[in-house]
Amino acid sequence: SVDKGYACGLLLENGGNLRVLEGHRAEKIILDQEGGLLVNGTTSAVVVDEGGELLVYPGGEACNCEINQGGVFMLAGKASDTLLAGGTMNNLGGEDSDTIVENGSIYRLGTDGIQLYSSGKTQNLSVNVGGRAEVHAGTLENAVIQGGTVILLSPTSADENFVVEEDRAPVELTGSVALLDGASMIIGYGADLQQSTITVQQGGVLILDGSTVKGDSVTFNIGNINLNGGKLWLITDAATQVQLKVKRLRGEGAICLQTSAKEISPDFINVKGEVTGDIHVEITDASRQTLCNALKLQP
């Protein structure tokens, strides 16, 4: 029904669209083949099925929406409690919180494939088995990754074809991030990690990718790392000096350094910051064949 700025219980398909104006509200809407919901007001309990599209403009808000396989959610306003159960969500300079990504779905922060939006932000992101999250620009604050993959792209590797909002494309990770069993996080060189605390549990993998850096030295800067049986990979090209700067590194686990350097010196890797616990260093070549292992990191 639609009455006096309020819509409820509609099925939109076959090119049918509904625009929710500022101050108006829509709830319990189903979007199917080529059905669209355009939101400048507020909406809730929207289900987006294959071929459907939900668009929330600046000033608009959406909550408790479900994006299924083949569905698309484009966000430039605000969203909360979104379930990506197989579809795609692009945050284009908006803000979302408590988003769940799973079952083959893809979440992207900061891009629509054409422009980078540095003002976007996601908070309390959950990436479960089969889910994938990509941060092209903007801020990721607090995340739990369980069986899924999160990629923070290097802000220095933006394609020339992108239009960059405000002539910059910062990528920032803040708050608490937990990598559980089967989870992986890949972070491109240059992303701002200073205000983050990353915990890597048994079976979890954190990768800091410095392979784009040319020259003899690479420095990785990060806030706090807790290794609870997990692994930290440092990827370099041909650098002969690698430094990991941390506020605090503690726990039990391994730091694995992958390099193409032909010569490995005893001081090849240096860790600067507070170090506690039982942490070992392994060094491998580009094919991950061990060059040196079982070196205990000295506090």
Task: Please report, for each region that a protein language model flagged, where it lies by residue.
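Short, solvent-exposed secondary-structure boundary motifs
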Residues: 1-2, 18-22, 35-39, 54-58, ...
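N-terminal non-cleavable signal-anchor helices
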Residues: 3, 21, 40, 47-49, ...
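Fold-core signature of tandem repeat domains
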Residues: 7-12, 18-20, 26-31, 37-39, ...
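Detector for Asparagine
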Residues: 14-17, 40, 64, 68, ...
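Generic short alpha-helical hydrophobic face used as a protein-protein interaction/packing hotspot
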Residues: 24, 60, 277-279
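Extracellular beta-strand/loop-rich repeat segments of large surface/secreted proteins
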Residues: 99, 146, 151-297
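A short, compositionally biased
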Residues: 109-111, 229
